[in-house]
């Protein structure tokens, strides 16, 4: 296969399945330890004054009957988790129009996560009443009926963010920044949230919430004539409308909010999460809470990796079934570096093992990084072989006998004998280095795809890229093989099972529905594919990932000012998202009745 040019380092261009040497195992792939239960309420970004010091990672020797002997299974201690929380306090920005329910959500966030709630209104009043230098400047403008300049407000916010309690507990910045200049000032000081939440409520609902409000001048209590009426006629008789709650003033405040929001949102587009605020308070908070929990989980794993002095590796330290540590960058540099390839091998391995441990028996792996995308001219068969070797050796470590199956040449018809794309891979597998522990021929054996290849001593089967081709439908052979395998796991690695024409050029219509149904019966345990503009492979716009037992995750690739890049989680789906759902994840949310637009945001229409 042809390899495209790249600017990657020489190490990145190393042979994709080079032997590791006679005195080394070809790849260490140990069994992940059982998942630990999550902490209550997942307040993992809330710092505790009594946080314990970092404890060392405890390792327990796990006896193993596989070819590579004993493996260590490590688990990070709770002390390390506490240190992670202390080092990575949660940082949240929240925005919402008047009467959007923002104040209520802020109270609930602070109550659960212990963040310091910072609003510019409160800051202004506190600074002015305290007579600080910043407060005196602000008072001068306010006394003269002028707006306080952006820089003065920013100085107040930055001063508050630098206080020990904020640095210890994290912060919730309420309604700030309100202008592009304020946002850029924070950016220039590298003050950036983990998430930017926007509460969205239709204009007519917002106006009704405000215009319908009534004030009890005796108690100061706020009522609403429809949503929260007074207790009795006596209270009702003394209610008054606040001067700010007329239709004209509410509409003016709403327009001002929209202008400010439109100016700020582009700065935080990669962190933006728009929440439907026109629901019950608890429902809105549950959605916000799930987003914050996700951030906390990711922060904990990153910090645990840092405290252990090395990148977290799922093969020797596993804290839960959600140990994902982010998507590697520079995936458009081909060939991929050894580090990137090993990263994906580990990611696939952990997800697959979780599925097998959960008694799943018909599994499918779909990984389309550039080196494994058959539609690109850089398809590297060695990368696929390395992945299969890692999977096989990992299960062999547990004493399982793995049959690795490769599809041969075409069978019947005019094209009989013509080799498939991967027809030579069995020979490659046989000459690869399988270590010095005698795995090949004992715990790992090779065969073709078919019922005759299923032996009673086989514990599981890995099928390498089974594919239908013109004149040859592999599905019938696969079905016979899985029937013979019974309840033993069968794992398909990058299958291509769409129906193809027969050797005469006529679609094989007989049994087509049954074949497609069988092909769809395999449960995806791992899926990763990059997202591009339609009809191209550059630039990378984002990624779609699923690692069992987690949901499908859509990520946006974001360019950093220093020439770096990162991937930001946009949305999650229980089922594999449709092209329209993926496209919509990359665009601001619209009314549910509006259809997805084509054009610029239709770039993902052909990816799946």
From Swiss-Prot:
Task: Give the enzyme's main class according to its UniProt record, as a single word.
Answer: transferase
Q: What EC number(s) has UniProt assigned to this enzyme?
A: 2.7.4.3
Low complexity bias locations: 1-20
Region spans: NMP? 119-148
The signal peptide stretch is none
Q: Does the keyword Flavoprotein apply?
A: no
Question: Where in or outside the cell?
Answer: Plastid, Chloroplast
What does the protein in this record do? Answer: Catalyzes the reversible transfer of the terminal phosphate group between ATP and AMP. Plays an important role in cellular energy homeostasis and in adenine nucleotide metabolism.
Alphabetized HAMAP family for the sequence:
Adenylate_kinase_Adk
What family is this? Belongs to the adenylate kinase family.
The protein here is known as Probable adenylate kinase 5, chloroplastic
Native organism taxonomy: Eukaryota, Viridiplantae, Streptophyta, Embryophyta, Tracheophyta
């Amino acid at each position: 296969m042809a390899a495209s040019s790249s600017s990657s380092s020489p190490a990145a261009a190393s042979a994709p399945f080079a032997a590791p040497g006679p005195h080394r195992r070809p790849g260490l792939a140990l069994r992940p330890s059982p998942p630990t239960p999550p902490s209550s309420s997942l307040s993992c970004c809330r710092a505790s004054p009594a946080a314990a010091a970092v404890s060392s990672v405890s390792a327990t020797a796990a006896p193993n009957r596989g070819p590579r002997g004993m493996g260590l299974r490590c688990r990070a201690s709770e002390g390390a988790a506490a240190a992670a929380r202390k080092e990575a306090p949660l940082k949240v920005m929240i925005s919402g129009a008047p009467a959007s329910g923002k104040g209520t959500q802020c109270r609930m966030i602070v109550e659960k996560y212990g963040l310091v709630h910072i609003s510019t209104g409160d800051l202004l009043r506190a600074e002015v009443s305290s007579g600080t230098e910043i407060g005196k400047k602000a008072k001068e403008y306010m006394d003269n009926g002028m707006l306080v300049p952006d820089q003065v407000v920013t100085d107040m916010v930055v001063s508050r963010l630098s206080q020990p309690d904020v640095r210890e507990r994290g912060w919730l910045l309420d309604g700030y920044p309100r202008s592009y200049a304020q946002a850029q000032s924070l950016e220039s000081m590298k003050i950036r949230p983990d998430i930017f939440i926007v509460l969205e409520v239709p204009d007519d609902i917002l106006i009704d919430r405000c215009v319908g409000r009534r004030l009890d001048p005796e108690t100061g209590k706020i009522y609403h004539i429809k949503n929260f009426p007074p207790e009795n006629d006596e209270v009702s008789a003394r209610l008054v409308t606040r001067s700010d709650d007329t239709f004209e003033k509410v509409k003016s405040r709403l327009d001002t909010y929209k202008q400010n929001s439109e100016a700020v949102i582009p700065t935080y587009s990669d962190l933006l999460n728009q929440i439907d605020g026109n629901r019950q308070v608890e429902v809105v908070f549950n959605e916000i809470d799930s987003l914050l929990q996700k951030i906390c989980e990711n922060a904990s794993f990153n910090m645990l990796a840092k405290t252990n002095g090395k990148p977290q590796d799922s093969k020797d330290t596993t804290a839960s079934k959600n140990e994902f540590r982010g998507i590697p960058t520079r995936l458009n540099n081909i060939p991929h570096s050894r580090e990137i390839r090993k990263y994906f091998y580990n990611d696939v391995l952990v997800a697959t093992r979780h599925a097998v441990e959960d008694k799943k028996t018909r599994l499918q792996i779909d990984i389309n990084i550039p080196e494994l995308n058959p539609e690109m001219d850089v398809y590297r068969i060695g990368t696929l072989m390395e992945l299969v070797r890692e999977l096989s050796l990992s299960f062999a470590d547990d004493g399982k006998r793995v049959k690795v199956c490769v599809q041969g040449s075409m069978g019947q018809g005019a094209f009989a004998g013509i080799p498939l794309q991967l027809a030579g891979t069995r020979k490659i597998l046989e000459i690869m280095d399988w270590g010095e522990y005698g795995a090949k021929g004992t715990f790992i054996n090779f065969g073709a795809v078919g019922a005759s290849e299923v032996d009673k001593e086989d514990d599981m089967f890995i099928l390498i890229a089974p594919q239908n081709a013109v004149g040859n439908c592999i599905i019938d052979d696969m079905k016979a093989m899985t029937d013979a395998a019974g309840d033993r796991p069968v794992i398909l690695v990058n299958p291509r099972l769409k129906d193809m024409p027969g050797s005469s050029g006529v679609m094989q219509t007989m049994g087509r529905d049954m074949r497609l149904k069988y092909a769809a019966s395999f449960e995806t345990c791992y899926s990763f594919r990059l997202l591009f503009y339609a009809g191209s492979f550059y630039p990378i716009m984002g990624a779609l990932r699923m690692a069992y037992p987690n949901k499908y995750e859509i990520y946006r690739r974001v360019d950093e000012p220093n020439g770096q890049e990162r991937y930001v989680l946009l949305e999650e789906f229980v089922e594999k998202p449709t092209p329209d759902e993926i496209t919509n994840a990359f665009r601001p949310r619209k009314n549910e009745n509006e259809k997805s637009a084509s054009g610029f945001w239709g770039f993902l229409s052909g990816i799946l």
